[in-house]
Regions:
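Flexible glycine/acidic-rich beta-alpha junction loops that bind and position SAM and/or redox cofactors
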Residues: 9, 58-59, 126-128, 157-165, ...
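Alpha-helix termini
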Residues: 69-78, 176-187
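Radical SAM [4Fe-4S] cluster-binding motif and immediate context
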Residues: 1-151
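Short beta-strand segments at enzyme active-site cores
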Residues: 46-49, 151-155, 187-192
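Radical SAM enzyme core and accessory elements
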Residues: 218-287
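Short, surface-exposed amphipathic charged segments that create phosphate/polyanion-binding patches used
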Residues: 100-103, 204-212, 273-274
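C-terminal, active-site-flanking charged/polar segments
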Residues: 134-137, 172-180, 193-199
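Catalytic cores of alpha/beta
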Residues: 101, 161-176
Length: 287
């Protein structure tokens, strides 16, 4: 299903900014009517929203949850009789996103929220233009745990401005959030590979904003970029950090998406670079 199209955020690594069009949303009533139709006609009780975010409009998202709760009451159904999952953006209390809103979504049936956590560093998060802080993330995570809502973490290692200290903050976050893995409120984590510059993302068109340089005279793209102001962040270092993040998460019991396959690929690439046998881009990557 879809709640909306486009996105209200402008993360500079995401091509939704340019490919998704402007943000537009259905009303909470429209989405509720669709959910009600599939439940009453086909018995569907578990829904997944396939859009970039389900809570782009706090007003319509709250209205949807209120209508679900009203429906449960009118039909003598328990809270969370219907469940829904989808991509979700983090907001802080200063944006009007209240604890009562999270409590409402939990009772209505919010199940597994896919969230771009990306990093444990506010410095990196601000550089990404994520639009929220670590305190905001903690605020939502604490409430999710109280309201039986799960979080699926999307992480990003090796962003161009990520320093050793920033990466340590990511490791600290992974360690600190292990309590939510133990409680079942973190359903999994996807580390991806390492940070890549995708065509269509703002950073692809404006690498100068982070003063990035390409290699071989080309525009910075994929993993082929250099940040002269963060020169120790070589491709080898990015892979090293990415491996370290997964090894820690694995040790702490995080369910990791394609864990073995990703780790084997990363270790192979790291070894090729260390041995000087990564021939395809050997001149581009400095150890």
């Amino acid at each position: 299903m879809e709640f909306s199209r486009g996105c209200v955020r402008t993360c500079n690594f995401c091509d939704w900014v340019t490919s998704g069009g402007g943000f537009r949303t259905k009303t909470g009533q429209q989405v509720f009517t669709e959910v009600k139709y599939y439940y009453e006609n086909f018995g569907v009780r578990n829904f997944y929203f396939n859009d970039a975010l389900i809570n782009g409009s706090i007003k319509e998202f709250n209205a949807f949850n209120e209508l679900l709760l009203k429906y449960y009451t009118e039909n003598n159904l328990p809270n969370r009789h219907l469940l829904y999952s989808g991509h979700f953006i983090i907001r802080g209390p200063d944006t009007g996103w209240k604890k009562s809103d999270i409590e409402r979504m939990g009772k209505a049936g919010a199940d597994n929220m896919v969230v771009g956590v990306e990093t444990g560093s506010d410095h990196v998060r601000k550089s990404m233009n994520k639009g929220y802080t670590l305190a905001d993330l903690d605020y939502n995570m604490e409430m999710f745990a109280k309201c039986d809502i799960k979080l699926y973490m999307l992480m990003m290692v090796g962003y161009p401005t990520e320093t050793d200290n920033d990466f340590q903050q990511t490791l600290d976050l992974i360690t600190r959030y292990q309590q939510y893995v133990a409680s079942g409120n973190i359903s999994g984590v996807n580390f991806g590979q390492t940070f890549v510059i995708e065509e269509g993302a703002p950073i692809f068109y404006h690498p100068e904003e982070l003063e990035l340089q390409g290699v071989d005279g080309k525009t910075p793209h994929d993993v082929f970029w250099i940040n002269p102001k963060n020169s120790t962040l070589t491709y080898k270092e990015r892979i090293k950090r990415r491996i370290a993040a997964q090894e820690l998460a694995n040790k702490l019991g995080y369910p990791i998406w394609r864990a073995d396959g990703q780790l084997n690929w990363l270790m192979a690439k790291y070894q090729e670079i260390a041995n000087g046998t990564y021939n395809e881009h050997k001149t581009r990557i400095q150890s």
